[in-house]
């Protein structure tokens, strides 16, 4: 890596990794790196862009959820944490829930069960087992499952390592904030902006009734979220999978302070001076999503009973393979068997 990044025929460096790796490339290592950083004398003298992950929030806006809504969205959040065993740069890590939501405990119960019942996965990424062991030692009474390889941990706002250290492992923090409605949304955005490290991706779950009630107030609050990709009723990884959208940290990273990186990739439309991308999805799966077709509803319709990327999807592997073949050049006729398998998820 050092040889390639400093080679005379390399004009620009881009990496995906950790802030530690970024610092090693830009400033070097050891005491010399400390001196260089203090003097603003980078070892790397060519432009660099980077995507470095971070701690991604999942903001759960309180509303009149049905029992089916609670179960589905709990699986949604579990997917954000457990997909690829938690080894994702934009895995959900801190769930922000209203302390005053009447359905708070029901939702958290569904979330613990969803985390515990998802298919077992090995924690394989280098260093993740060590971080998991450290969390287990610090929180032996948390809701552990999968043989001690997963946890749901209630933490105090503004005072926990889960807020400032990307775990890259199946550990999910839960923070309770006061308020409901617009007051809660404002408080949750302030908390995410001020206390969670990184600006790569933020997820927001809100039912159509509450979104319609909050109207433009909700949209204006989204504008204050300092994240490169915001997903409303979706996972920010969908933004990563959409080539037309930019993917990277919220603008403002520097060589000396880039917790989620500098610059963007993808952006197939080559748009300039972008702050963020916003991805929107359906709050409910098919057929319950058909309720979103009512007049004046801000909800979105879905034709999928279970999205194929959910960790609970029974046909996720075959559907993902079929969609990949379709995007690589397959025709609509070849897509039909894949859609049929998706309906059976």
For each feature predicted by the language model, list its residue ranges.
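Short hydrophobic/charged patches on amphipathic alpha-helices used for structural packing
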Residues: 1-2, 189
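ALDH superfamily catalytic-core signature
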Residues: 6-12, 19-160, 182, 232, ...
């Amino acid at each position: 890596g050092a040889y390639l990044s400093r080679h005379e025929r390399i004009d620009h460096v881009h990496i995906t990794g950790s802030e530690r790796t970024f610092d090693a490339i830009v400033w070097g290592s050891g005491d010399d790196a400390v001196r260089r950083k203090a003097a603003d004398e980078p070892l790397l003298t060519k432009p660099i862009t980077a995507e470095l992950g971070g701690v991604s929030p999942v903001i759960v806006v309180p509303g009149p959820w049905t029992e089916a809504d609670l179960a589905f969205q709990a699986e949604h959040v579990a997917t954000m944490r457990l997909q690829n065993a938690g080894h994702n740069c934009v895995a959900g890590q801190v769930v922000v829930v209203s302390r005053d939501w009447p359905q708070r405990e029901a939702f958290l119960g569904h979330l613990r069960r969803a985390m515990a019942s998802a298919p077992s996965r090995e924690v394989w990424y280098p260093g993740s087992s060590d971080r998991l062991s450290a969390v287990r030692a610090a929180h032996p009474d948390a809701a552990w499952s999968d043989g001690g390889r997963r946890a749901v941990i209630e933490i105090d706002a503004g005072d926990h390592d889960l807020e400032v250290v990307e775990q890259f492992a199946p550990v999910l923090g839960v923070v309770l904030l006061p308020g409901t409605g617009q007051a809660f949304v404002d408080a949750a955005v302030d908390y995410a902006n001020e206390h969670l490290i990184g600006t790569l991706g933020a997820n927001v779950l809100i039912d159509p009734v509450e979104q319609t009630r909050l109207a433009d107030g909700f949209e204006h609050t989204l504008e204050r979220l300092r994240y490169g990709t915001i997903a409303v009723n979706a996972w920010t990884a969908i933004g990563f999978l959409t080539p037309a959208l930019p993917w990277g940290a919220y603008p403002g990273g520097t060589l000396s302070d880039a917790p989620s990186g500098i610059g963007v990739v993808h952006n197939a439309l080559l748009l300039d001076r972008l702050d963020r991308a916003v991805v929107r999805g359906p709050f409910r799966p098919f057929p319950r999503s058909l309720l979103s077709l009512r007049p004046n509803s801000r909800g979105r319709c879905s034709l999928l009973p279970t999205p194929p990327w959910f960790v609970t999807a029974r046909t996720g592997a075959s559907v993902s393979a079929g969609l990949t073949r379709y995007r690589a050049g397959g025709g609509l006729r070849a897509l039909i068997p894949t859609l049929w398998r998706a309906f059976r998820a």
